[in-house]
Design a protein with these regions (language model features):
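Local cysteine-cluster metal-coordination motifs and their immediate loop/turn environment
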Residues: 9-20
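Alpha/beta-hydrolase
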Residues: 6-8, 118
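Conserved non-cysteine loop/helix-boundary elements of the Radical SAM core domain that shape
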Residues: 22-46, 50-160
Length: 160
């Protein structure tokens, strides 16, 4: 099994528990997307002809990308690698990025799995972690996502 992980090192804000490298400035986002596309092309020779079964957008917060940027990067993978007929394509997302309109938009793309960073349904925990969403928003986005996606995971932090 072969998969491609695409790291998106941007976030709207810093969560207090996060140790990952990221930037809250979006000034270089377009430049980074183009650099990722170049990296996808440059790494083509390392694939040994294996079929790509999964494409995973992780981060940071990949849901800060526009649908056009996501589609562009997926197209780069398809153009440069042998991709199975129905690959699992995951986008990590925060609830505050998943409006009803955005979920519908993503459902029309090749993304077929959402990994939603809810972290907690408790308001005190969310505030302490400096999350941008509240519990009601998390529940609403999860309910909305289930209308359009059959494959959803959520991140929860235990014992905060």
């Amino acid at each position: 099994m072969s998969g491609i992980y695409i790291h998106i090192p941007f976030c709207k804000q810093a969560c207090h528990y996060c140790d990952f490298h990221f930037s809250t400035s979006m000034k270089k986002k377009e430049e980074m997307v183009l650099a990722l596309a170049k990296e996808i092309r440059l790494r083509k020779s390392e694939s040994d002809g294996e079929n790509v079964e999964t494409i995973y957008f992780g981060g940071g917060t990949p849901s800060v990308l526009t649908s056009g940027e996501i589609d562009f990067l997926i197209a780069e993978v398809y153009e440069n690698y042998s991709v199975v007929e129905n690959p699992e394509i995951t986008l990590e997302a925060n609830p505050d990025d998943l409006s009803s309109e955005r979920i519908l938009e993503l459902s029309k793309s090749k993304v077929n799995r959402l990994s939603i960073g809810i972290q907690s349904f408790f308001e005190d925990d969310l505030q302490m972690m400096n999350r941008a969403h509240n519990s009601a928003e998390a529940q609403k986005c999860l309910k909305e996502a289930t209308k359009y996606f059959d494959n959803i995971s959520i991140d929860l932090i235990y014992g905060v």
